[in-house]
Amino acid sequence: MFQYIKDQWANGRAIYGKKSWRETRRVILHFLRTVGHKQEMMEYKAFFESYAPDQHILDKQEGLYELMSRIFLFKDSTLRERIDAVKNHFTALEDVFTPETIEMLYNPDELKPEGLKQGILLWEDADLNMTAHLNFMTGQRKEGLFTILLQLGDQGVYHANIRLGKGLEGEPALWIGTIQGYKDGLDNAKHITKKMFGYRPKNFIVFLIRELAKYCKVQSMYAVSDEGFYANTHMVRGHKAKVAELDPLWEDIGGTVTQDPRFFKIPLEEYRKPIEEIKSQKRSQYRKRYELLNKYEEQIRDNVKKYLK
């Protein structure tokens, strides 16, 4: 038991450091929240120690321990739900990606091979000077266990935090924790929308998620609602304003609220309006957009296939 207690304190130090009182306070809170859950913490650790693609993920990404002491992923998530979410995600990965790919994605950047520092290149367009990468970004673990980062040059435009796992009916599913934009995003979004024939970058990152979902063997897709956003758990502390406003996007892409208002169910395929139903003055724009997206679908398929089982 003494060794377990020491381990929980060490985990907190590894996550938060010890340079300031604020960091020490977080270490204390992590310790107090985990020390009484020995069975669950040992289960969590044992899962990763026997994880075939890489038994050292927790050693290299200590931040994953924070999911055991903080109400992350979605509002009012329980410790049991978070343990299951993490285990289900990593179990699903084994059915999709090669062991070498999983190990690479969860390696710290300094251990990634040259050319893969940002993870898997999902998509790029040299004419637009844009790229999209799939990676594990430790700072985004509050909302997901994967991040798709959409960039214009070296500037972030949007990122989506996602995870694999089980849906509300126990089916293989992909979960979107959030989609967030970056500073100067509005100006960039206008530029990108024009170049993509009226297709907004916020919708494009959903397109990228859906394309990835094709290769992840999922049967459904869900998104966390504004009501379910993890940070809204803490609104009772005085933060009265909602910190996420994504419901309009989920509705725009065909999502519907589930019986649990914390989640939307999202169609796996994007609806494309038939050309004949589009006003004549906009048909050329839509036709070019659809042709562009079809080309991107082929590129994404070619980019990811070498990482798949």
PLM features per residue range, with description:
Residues 1-191, 288-309:
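Non-catalytic substrate-recognition and accessory regions of acyl/acetyltransferase enzymes
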Residues 71-74, 203, 214-220, 262-268, ...:
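Noncatalytic linker/hinge segments flanking ATPase motor cores
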Residues 255-309:
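Charge-rich, low-complexity intrinsically disordered segments
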Residues 26, 75, 130, 191, ...:
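Generic, low-specificity signal for short hydrophobic/alpha-helical stretches with a mild N-terminal bias
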Residues 108, 112-115, 119, 234-236, ...:
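Charge-rich, low-complexity amphipathic helices
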Residues 158, 167-257:
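Acyl-donor binding region in acyl/amide transferases
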